[in-house]
Regions:
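Extracytosolic ligand-binding ectodomains
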Residues: 2-17, 21-398
Length: 398
């Protein structure tokens, strides 16, 4: 089986039905998006997302495009800035006259640009936003792909309860995703029988987290959840925990303790760390293995969750166009509201708001430099290493 046919078969949504080889004379379907390629906050994550979009473009066009036309992404760098992204989506729709749009990186930027897409009645699949409140504003043309952030720590707390742990501390950045993860963890902890013994929100990311971490140390929690959309925060917190000899039975760095970059920066200091995860390379989703292989070949590095999310959003858009034989936002919306399927990201199903009800997060732990899925039971790829040993008993040299 050749590579193109393999992707068409395994990814399902790129089946040969309804596709024909695009003529060079046919105009491409232009898909606009902004992505955080630069900027201090999201450039790592945005870079992964952009590559996911571009790989999907390559595969769709290799199979003949959709409706006999190739697809072409028009992607601008929003610099990790909400106002810039708003201007760019206005430009994409009003000036560039793109045929469709897909979402940017992150809940905050997605929430901001959704006002633009709603104004123009332009459907937007949002592959990298996981905050429930975005879908509580009566928006019609916004489709969610990721599981809600409130459930991101369910696996962590389920495992904590199973192992007899009783107390939880939470520190988190003041932002849409981090707030939802922290709120969800606090509520889940009560249901699992864990007491919340410390909670602190920080608004500006400090270079030195020792003040907060010393308060955590005094609270003596069994479990610590650190939540931030800034990878730099999670790296600094983990590193400074070692410096302060702050030991917990379980540490979760959410949501980006799961990124390869987290381990690359920390080395063995990242061992035993947990994180929720919206996607993992080894999960048995249709086409996932071939997606990972193709991504590594194309970009000479492993994909991250944003790569898979961008690719999957493109998958869904192409399938909606194929089903409706249209680029009309209302028709595409109706197709997606009734679609129940699997992408490389996992299950997809939304309610009448476009809010995700099918996709579920898993929980991973860093073990010997690898992300091992340790929850839920039906998807595990290895055994949890519990408890986390004290820093004094660990070899953390890189």
């Amino acid at each position: 089986m050749n590579k193109i046919r393999a992707f068409g078969t395994l990814l399902g949504l790129f089946s040969a039905v309804g596709l024909s080889w695009p003529s060079s004379a046919q105009q491409p379907i232009r898909i606009g998006a902004s992505m955080s390629i630069t900027g201090k906050s999201y450039s790592v994550q945005g870079g992964y997302g952009r590559k996911g979009y571009l790989l999907c473009q390559k595969h769709v066009n290799a199979q003949g495009g959709v409706l006999g036309r190739p697809i072409e992404f028009v992607i601008y760098d929003d610099g990790s800035d909400e106002k810039t992204a708003v201007s760019l989506y206005e430009k994409l729709i009003a000036e560039d006259k793109v045929d469709a749009v897909l979402g940017p990186y992150g809940s905050a930027i997605t929430d901001a640009v959704a006002d633009v897409t709603e104004k123009h009645r332009k459907l937007m699949i949002a592959p990298m936003a996981a905050t429930t409140s975005i879908w509580e504003k009566g928006r019609r043309y916004l489709i969610m792909m990721l599981a809600p952030g409130e459930g991101f720590s369910e696996g962590l707390l389920d495992l904590a309860a199973r192992n007899g742990l009783r107390t939880l501390a939470v520190i988190h950045q003041d932002g849409l995703v981090a707030n939802s993860i922290a709120k969800g963890a606090s509520e889940l902890a009560k249901r699992k029988g864990l007491e919340l013994v410390f909670l602190e929100t920080y608004r500006t990311s400090p270079a030195d987290f020792s003040g907060i971490l010393n308060k955590v140390k005094a609270a003596k929690p069994d479990v610590l959840l650190a939540a931030s959309i800034r990878l730099e925060d999670l790296v600094a917190i983990t590193r400074q925990m070692k410096e302060l000899d702050l030991n917990v039975r379980m540490l979760s760095s959410a949501p980006y303790g799961l990124l390869p970059d987290y381990y690359q920066r920390l080395g063995k200091e990242a061992e035993f760390v947990y994180s929720g995860s919206f996607w993992e390379a080894g999960l048995p989703y249709p086409g996932n293995r071939d997606f990972v292989t193709a991504y590594e070949k194309e970009f000479n590095r492993a994909p991250a969750v944003q790569s898979a999310a961008g690719y999957a959003a493109c998958q869904l858009f192409v399938e909606a166009v194929r089903r409706t034989r249209s680029l009309d936002s209302d028709k595409l919306r109706e197709a997606l509201l009734t679609l129940r399927t699997k992408t490389v990201l996992g299950d997809f199903a939304v309610d009448e708001r476009g809010f995700q009800i099918g996709h579920k997060a898993v929980t991973i732990q860093w073990q010997d430099g690898k992300q091992v899925v340790i929850w839920p039971d039906e998807l595990v790829s290895g055994k949890v290493r519990f408890p986390t040993p004290p820093w004094s008993q660990r070899s953390t040299s890189k």
